[in-house]
From Swiss-Prot:
Name the record gives this protein: Ribosomal protein uS12 methylthiotransferase RimO
Ranges for domain MTTase N-terminal: 31-141
NCBIfam families to which the protein is assigned, alphabetical: 30S ribosomal protein S12 methylthiotransferase RimO, MiaB/RimO family radical SAM methylthiotransferase
Domain Radical SAM core: residue ranges: 158-397
Principal location: cytoplasm
Gene of this entry: rimO
Catalytic activity, as annotated: L-aspartate(89)-[ribosomal protein uS12]-hydrogen + (sulfur carrier)-SH + AH2 + 2 S-adenosyl-L-methionine = 3-methylsulfanyl-L-aspartate(89)-[ribosomal protein uS12]-hydrogen + (sulfur carrier)-H + 5'-deoxyadenosine + L-methionine + A + S-adenosyl-L-homocysteine + 2 H(+)
Compartments it resides in: Cytoplasm
Amino acid sequence: MRAMSTNPPNLRPDLAPAARLGTAATRPGQPTIGMVSLGCPKALVDSERILTRLRAEGYGISPDYAGADAVIVNTCGFLDSAKAESLDAIGEALKENGKVIVTGCLGAEPDYIREHHPRILAVTGPHQYEQVLDAVHGAVPPDPDPFVDLLPASGVQLTPRHYSYLKISEGCNHKCKFCIIPDMRGKLASRPAHAVLREAEKLVDNGVKELLIISQDTSAYGLDRKYDTNLWKNREVRSHITDLARELGQLDAWVRLHYVYPYPHVRELIPLMADAGCNLLPYLDIPFQHAHPDTLKRMARPAAAARTLDEIAAWREICPEITLRSTFIVGYPGETEAEFQTLLDWMDEAQLDRVGCFQYENVAGARSNDLPDHVPAEVKQERWDRFMAKAQAISEAKLAARVGQVIEVIVDEVDDEAATCRTKSDAPEIDGNLFIDEGFEGLQPGDIVTVEVDEAGEYDLWGRLR
């Protein structure tokens, strides 16, 4: 067996690795800004938009604290552990640079931030781009040079050049008791279909090979707009996830859907995934969270686990190669051993391909904090261990069945030892990889190549070029 990678699925998709930006060299005297981006891909898109605006105004982007005239920290406030990470990042930026502007979800609690870090220059809430720019202008006045300061046509990206997150809406209409996202980011606000498609086309024209569609609730896209129509390429396109996915699937790039709730109309997407002429990947990221109806009711989630299994069966009948990813919470207040066992039994039936799980923790402001019968920490850990053991066994069996298959992969990274790739079943950061460790020297990030799978592990595959 080749050496196993240390790459199980990311168990905390709400806390993606921090992204720091490095870009082209700045000109002499150019004001420069550093960026630390924490949290989910939706926050990463906010960071990209802020940096794109700053580049358009003549600011340079520094990859380190020392070269920056000021630093923006885009925070996460979804969980208490995320708040602690954000406070640590702010403290590090203050220590290393001294001029710090805070934005993002934790920015919705300015008094809390200033209590811990009174030296910060300014605090703004999530997706408040204009306020961030105003704060930057006050700390570091712009000094643009129109003959030198060039902005990439696709804007500034914090991801590798070959894939990009595409945010189609803000906010959420759900009232899940464990979540404070609607309080921080507001109700659902969908972008017009033509604006999404124009951005997607520009990204693909500039070399992006994979579009990762994100929002708080992707399947609710357009609900707030009453599914209005927009003119795109001399035809009308409805602001509905099915219509949007169909149009995106005509672009020359992989299209991957994240944060899809299992509404009945999701079944309309599955034939598009099965259509060889559409680039919508057979992949659904659906946050089921639990399977026992009583637990789901306490979460204020749709309590229809039995129908969920029926939907999964229907999806697989239409598109047998579909990959299903989900995240779950164990140890939610009031969760009994019987309820947890129902979740394990549901997992046996659902046979999900990619699974992440985290133990429940209180979040300041969440209604779940006041629920009775909180689960002891040692019980939460024990249940998490049992859940992940089952998920790992399912993953290992499913990947073993892929040995001998010939599949397409996209190259993410190439070093001296191997090319790190992903299959159509794997999203960046949160899923597994396929490694090519022979004959890979000519590959470049963004290449899409054909491989034969010749070995499988618990979460990763290995293959050789065909």
